């Protein structure tokens, strides 16, 4: 298998630690070996100056990533919460969730053109779109994107993508946006369970706890509104959407591995092409069977449809390519922060009741989501941190006791000459 640099997995809506399943698969740049001067660490002011300059550069880079992270978190939160609320608003006048799914997925075609525009602006070595396309097609194998590869490695993901979005949008018709957004956060727990079973990922007890919390939150959310038909169906739809998304990510890791930014953009554009070619017939059938019917095309809220599509496209662009400028964990926070945003909007625009059971369920699912953001070596880091704090406390205690011990001795030494007189 060929190696890639600057990797990112598509549809990173709830990957772990952000959005790359269970491992950070952002830019996998090997750490450069230290130079001779740094390796030998020469004594003197020169070595100290180099160390201070190196630390200053590292701190600047980290600070820059944090600032970018705040911007990315805001974009993820705003686009995800905005698309959810706009979909709910659209269904008041246009009751066609599958048609909305089809329309928004068509916009995936823009991924590769947008990526190429960024490549032309940023890259020093300019390539034509055809050259860049051929290079990215190597991701699918030595023969590139053949008809067989299209139907075996792209079509299944196109179906999963459509199911994920359709079930999510259909659930918004049944239950409020707050419940939908928080239940979709269980996606990370499902990814962990599937990757543990299928991909043989490392077992982590804290992630098992997170999965248990997610399941408990689903049960409590069902109990919050009572076991009414609309509530149960809506919750089942969201859980199904989260499951389809988790299956999408795990299968992508299993069959395709991870991709460069250009390869991911090409893959997502291919999903848009698949949607146009093979999914278009379904909205047509639903229209003529009056399952999703509207009187005239003038009744379609085109502004809402385009706004939802732009927000969803922005959400996926930021999640898939934001890893180039910030930490994956910061990006994931935008997903969970969209829950309180939806809660505030629902409080003022709908008749949602935040009873004790619903609030506890939201907290439990959110806690499980945050536990899945912990890195694999979090326990080692925690032990090191506690050890450092313990050593520092001992040093401070020793220094304070030393100061108390030297104080009387110094005073007695100063007092001795006066007694000698």
Swiss-Prot record:
Ranges of compositional bias, category Basic residues: 411-421
Membrane topology listed for this record: Multi-pass membrane protein
GO BP: thiamine transport
GO cellular component: membrane
InterPro entries: EamA_dom, Solute_c_fam_35_mem_F3/F4
One Pfam family recorded for the sequence: EamA
Compositionally biased tracts (Low complexity): 37-49
Catalytic activity: thiamine(in) = thiamine(out)
Main location: membrane
Keywords recorded for this protein, A-Z: Membrane, Transmembrane, Transmembrane helix, Transport
Residue ranges of coiled coil: none
Location of the protein in the cell: Membrane
SUPFAM superfamilies named among the record's database cross-references: Multidrug resistance efflux transporter EmrE
Region (Disordered): 25-53, 394-421
Regions that span the bilayer: 66-86, 98-118, 149-169, 179-199, 208-228, 232-252, 266-286, 305-325, 326-346, 352-372
Origin: domain of life: Eukaryota
Family (UniProt): Belongs to the SLC35F solute transporter family.
Primary role: Mediates thiamine transport.
Name of this protein: Solute carrier family 35 member F3
Organism: Mus musculus (Mouse)
């Amino acid at each position: 298998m060929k190696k890639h640099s600057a990797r990112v997995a598509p549809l990173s809506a709830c990957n772990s630690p952000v959005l790359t399943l269970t491992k950070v698969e952002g830019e996998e740049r090997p750490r450069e070996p230290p130079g001779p001067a740094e390796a030998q660490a020469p004594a003197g002011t020169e070595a100290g100056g180099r160390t201070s300059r190196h630390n200053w550069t590292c701190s600047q880079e980290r600070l820059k990533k944090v600032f970018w992270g705040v911007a990315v978190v805001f974009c993820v939160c705003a686009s995800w919460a905005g698309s959810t609320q706009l979909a709910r608003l659209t269904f008041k006048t246009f009751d066609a969730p599958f048609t909305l799914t089809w329309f928004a997925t068509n916009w995936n075609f823009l991924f590769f053109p947008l990526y190429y525009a960024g490549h032309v602006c940023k890259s020093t070595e300019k390539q034509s779109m055809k050259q860049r396309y051929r290079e990215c097609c190597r991701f699918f194998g030595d023969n590139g994107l053949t008809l067989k590869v299209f139907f075996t490695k792209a079509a299944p993901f196109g179906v999963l993508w459509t199911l994920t979005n359709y079930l999510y949008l259909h659930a918004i018709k049944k239950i409020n946006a707050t419940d939908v957004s928080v239940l979709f956060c269980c996606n990370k727990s499902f990814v962990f369970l599937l990757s543990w079973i299928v991909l043989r990922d490392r077992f982590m007890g804290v992630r098992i706890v997170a999965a248990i919390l997610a399941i408990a939150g689903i049960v409590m959310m069902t109990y919050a509104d009572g076991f009414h038909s609309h509530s149960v169906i809506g919750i089942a739809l969201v859980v199904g959407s989260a499951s389809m998304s988790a299956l999408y990510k795990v299968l992508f890791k299993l069959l395709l591995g991870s991709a460069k930014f250009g390869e991911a953009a090409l893959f997502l554009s291919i999903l848009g092409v698949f949607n146009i070619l093979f999914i278009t017939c379904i909205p047509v059938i639903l229209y003529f069977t009056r399952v999703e019917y509207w009187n005239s095309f003038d009744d379609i809220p085109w502004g809402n449809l385009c706004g939802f599509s732009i927000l969803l496209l922005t959400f996926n662009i930021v999640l898939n390519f934001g890893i180039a400028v910030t930490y994956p964990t910061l990006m994931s926070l935008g997903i969970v922060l969209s829950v309180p945003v939806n809660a505030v909007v629902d409080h003022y625009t709908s008749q949602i009741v935040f009873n004790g059971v619903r609030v506890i369920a939201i907290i439990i699912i959110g806690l499980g989501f945050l536990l899945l953001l912990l890195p694999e070596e979090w326990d080692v880091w925690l032990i090191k941190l506690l050890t450092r704090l313990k050593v520092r406390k001992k040093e401070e205690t020793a220094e304070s006791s030393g100061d108390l011990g030297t104080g009387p001795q110094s005073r007695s030494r100063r007092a001795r000459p006066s007694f000698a007189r």
